[in-house]
């Protein structure tokens, strides 16, 4: 048996002897070398595959919070995942968030998480910036995951503030100071999920580090304007506000959910100058995507477009049939040609979906 690299993904060639002849078959195998057998490896932040500077991250205008698709048994569907990432590259996205909220990092083991970051780097790291979500409400876990993420080659880390077991402002500063020295970092402020706002004082303190690439900000455009006036790079974390954030409040771009579905249109929204007509055209889709907590609607939409299997890791479940029917209408209004995939959009029945509780 021998191995080879095709498109930077791992393939294995088997030699098979039959009736005195020898033939070779090639089959794809997931990059097991990237799987960390023990989470607590003695890696250090200087042991990295790629060395990226914060300025390289600061320039990105369209970053997609990429979806993680699944096989019927709940394991990662890497073939579908690779298709999703390739479609982002082909349609002009400059970066992907791996294992974020949209990618359901909260439903992954750390072994899965680091493997997926490493796989994305190995297959696509030369074509798109790979930003690994290695944040945690435990500083200890955030340190270990970030060390390992940089060790397998991610270009930057995404860090949320500690949630549920909230800490003081001094605790927030200490938490972020523990991970910032490792490499380029985006701090993610989403109080609706964490229960705690990261105030500007904390970000201003973190901005003293050369590794702070910027902030993914979900509080609103007043906060975006405050940071941009202070010279802090900001990405809008709200798709429905990103056009105004970009062109009226100085945001560098967006870290987007909607771009999973219409990456080309989202690129146009971020690169092409003010375009209120396009923004209005996309607004029904954006509102539909966030009718229920993300990523429920996105998972449903990608399944209806036929680009991922209709498999959900619980506790996420698909949208109601009425909302699935509404999505078909939205696709027709925007134009099927603007969405990823080649199949006609479908209205899936309830029994088409697979819900996996053990994964």
From Swiss-Prot:
Its EC number is 4.3.3.7. SMART domains: DHDPS. InterPro entries: Aldolase_TIM, DapA, DapA-like, Schiff_base-form_aldolases_AS, Schiff_base-form_aldolases_CS. Pathway: Amino-acid biosynthesis; L-lysine biosynthesis via DAP pathway; (S)-tetrahydrodipicolinate from L-aspartate: step 3/4. Residues 1-33 form a transit peptide. It catalyses: L-aspartate 4-semialdehyde + pyruvate = (2S,4S)-4-hydroxy-2,3,4,5-tetrahydrodipicolinate + H2O + H(+). The record marks 101, 164 as: Part of a proton relay during catalysis. Keywords: Amino-acid biosynthesis, Chloroplast, Diaminopimelate biosynthesis, Lyase, Lysine biosynthesis, Plastid, Schiff base, Transit peptide. Pyruvate binds at residues 102, 255. Catalyzes the condensation of (S)-aspartate-beta-semialdehyde [(S)-ASA] and pyruvate to 4-hydroxy-tetrahydrodipicolinate (HTPA). Belongs to the DapA family. This is 4-hydroxy-tetrahydrodipicolinate synthase, chloroplastic. It comes from Nicotiana tabacum.
